[in-house]
């Protein structure tokens, strides 16, 4: 068999040919005329590195490198994509933007927890209440920034879920143990609490609108829970996180509106005659200490949504030139500015209106107890209806991690995406399981202090630890000491607030009435 001839080295003319267009010559100059005397010999370059003047449009290798560089800058950091992510509701759609991020963060960050902040002020007073709320707000805003930055901290990897980031920082097994329970509660537990609050608020709305005309055969509380759950299941059929951006916008608008209405209506009415702004005192010093810890736990519980930050950011496209953390942080700044405009007026205005007479149920309970006959029924009914809309919208975003987990288990076993019927079945199942837990544990929404302590590390502690373990700042530097100290301070507060929440349950005589919701 004949041997293949060696590849010849083709010579490149030193100057462009006469027919070369002007646009192909350097700086668009006309091609120089050929020499009048014919060249006696043709010079062939013997080096693979051509002089710059020999290649007006660049060598083929240079063009390939330039094109490849541009492609990588547009596509990203050579991120290794998991094919399964294209089948899951959190990462199925990656066309999010800063507006979607603002909608989702507002929907997740403003909710029923803010309505009980004046209860904490009743135990802390003016100075300590405002100071504690301000410190907690700044602290959680910083840890939010940490999570946004850690989403793509390792080149070639996007941490699309909170548990994934915890596993990368703490290790596979320890990360699951530390992050799974609080994130599951903040997802499934919040969904259950939303069913309880949404159902009870629908019942109050019905009573206000109908008045004495509808007292013959009203629905029970459990039946209102079922009505609210059915509405949640219908809305949960939207396929992925980006598809509920419209619902998040509705939830954000309604949450801001009813938060403003609640404190404005409270401040505009005459204050109770026996109002006092002295912090509530307990018979013993230890009792007062635990009451303060429980109040701080209520403040910590008011800041929610950090378990969804990475999930929201994973819905955005990310490239080397346009990383996802830029629009995510832009949307987060807008949303948390609006969140501050909600929680601070509620806390200060609510405590000013009711003082230490604030009932444990929060602002809605205070409005209903003190001003049911003073405020026009239309305004009161509107406020309650907005709370229902906000709870319906919040249920969708807090349930999305649970939907994602169900579908991840299915797709990993079958190696195919969920069909419409399977996806709908998972969401119906989750909705009715949440309803069942709400009926079985009707006291769940009254454990704000305890639950705030148990879930506090997700917001205030773990992000600081993960920053040190992933970014690896210089040991014993200020950055190293600051994040370790802030993280361990969050863990200490978590233990203290949990103890305060348990003490509050014991002192107030919380009756664990299983399967006995209020009538």
Swiss-Prot record:
**What is the first-listed, main subcellular location in coarse terms?**
membrane
Task: State its location(s).
Answer: Cell membrane
Topology versus the membrane: Multi-pass membrane protein
Topology, Cytoplasmic side: 1-114, 157-176, 239-243, 304-333, 399-427, 471-485
Q: Domain of life, per the record?
A: Eukaryota
Which GO BP annotation is one of this protein's? amino acid transport
Q: Which residues lie on this side of the membrane: Extracellular?
A: 198-217, 265-282, 355-377, 449, 507-519
> Which keywords fit this entry according to its UniProt record?
Amino-acid transport, Cell membrane, Membrane, Transmembrane, Transmembrane helix, Transport
Zinc-finger as a keyword of this entry, yes or no, is no
Q: What PANTHER family does the database record attribute to this sequence?
A: OS05G0424000 PROTEIN-RELATED
User: Would you identify the family this protein belongs to, as annotated?
Assistant: Belongs to the amino acid/polyamine transporter 2 family. Amino acid/auxin permease (AAAP) (TC 2.A.18.2) subfamily.
Q: What is this protein called?
A: Lysine histidine transporter-like 8
Q: Which organism is it from?
A: Arabidopsis thaliana (Mouse-ear cress)
Q: What is the lineage of its organism?
A: Eukaryota, Viridiplantae, Streptophyta, Embryophyta, Tracheophyta
């Amino acid at each position: 068999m004949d041997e293949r001839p060696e590849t010849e080295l083709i010579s490149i003319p030193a100057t462009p040919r006469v027919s070369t267009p002007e646009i192909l010559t350097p700086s668009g100059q006309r091609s120089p005329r050929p020499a009048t005397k014919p060249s006696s010999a043709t010079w062939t370059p013997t080096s693979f590195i051509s002089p710059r003047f020999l290649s007006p449009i660049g060598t083929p290798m240079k063009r390939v490198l330039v094109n490849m560089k541009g492609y990588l800058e547009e596509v990203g950091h050579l991120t290794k994509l998991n094919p399964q992510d294209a089948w899951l509701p959190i990462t199925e759609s990656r066309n999010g933007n800063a507006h979607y991020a603002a909608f989702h963060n507002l929907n997740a960050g403003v909710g029923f927890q803010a309505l009980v902040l004046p209860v904490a002020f009743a135990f802390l007073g003016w100075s300590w209440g405002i100071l504690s709320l301000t410190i907690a707000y700044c602290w959680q805003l910083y840890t939010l920034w940490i999570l946004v930055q850690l989403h793509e901290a390792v080149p070639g990897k996007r941490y699309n879920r909170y548990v994934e980031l915890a596993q990368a920082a703490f290790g596979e097994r320890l990360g699951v143990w530390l992050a799974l329970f609080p994130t599951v509660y903040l997802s499934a537990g919040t969904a259950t609490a939303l069913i309880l609050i949404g159902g009870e608020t629908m019942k109050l709305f019905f009573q206000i609108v109908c008045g004495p005309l509808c007292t013959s055969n009203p629905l029970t509380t459990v039946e209102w829970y079922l009505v609210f759950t059915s509405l949640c299941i219908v809305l949960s059929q939207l396929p992925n996180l980006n598809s509920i951006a419209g619902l998040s916008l509705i939830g954000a608008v309604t949450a801001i509106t009813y938060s403003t209405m609640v404190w404005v209506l409270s401040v505009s009415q005459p204050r109770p005659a026996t109002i006092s702004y002295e912090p509530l005192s307990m018979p013993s010093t230890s009792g007062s200490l635990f009451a303060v810890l429980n109040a701080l736990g209520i403040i910590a519980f008011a800041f929610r949504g950090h378990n969804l930050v990475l999930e929201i950011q994973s819905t955005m496209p990310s490239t080397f030139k346009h990383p996802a953390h830029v629009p995510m942080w832009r949307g987060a700044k807008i949303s948390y500015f609006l969140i501050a405009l909600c929680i601070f007026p509620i806390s200060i205005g609510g405590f000013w209106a009711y003082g230490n007479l604030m009932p444990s149920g929060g602002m809605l309970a205070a409005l209903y107890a003190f001003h049911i006959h003073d405020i026009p029924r239309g305004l009161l009914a509107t406020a309650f209806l907005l709370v229902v809309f906000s709870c319906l919208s919040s249920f969708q975003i807090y349930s999305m991690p649970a939907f994602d987990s169900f579908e991840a288990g299915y797709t990993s076993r079958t190696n195919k995406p969920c069909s419409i019927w399977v996806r709908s079945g998972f969401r119906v199942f989750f909705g009715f399981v949440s309803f069942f837990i709400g009926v079985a544990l009707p006291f769940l929404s009254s454990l704000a202090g305890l639950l705030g302590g148990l879930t506090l590390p997700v917001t205030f502690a773990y992000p600081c630890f993960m920053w040190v373990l992933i970014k690896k700042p210089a040991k014993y530097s200020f950055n190293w000491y600051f994040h370790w100290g802030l993280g361990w301070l969050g863990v200490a507060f978590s233990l203290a607030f949990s103890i305060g929440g348990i003490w509050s349950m014991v002192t107030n005589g919380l009756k664990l009435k299983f399967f006995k919701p209020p009538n």
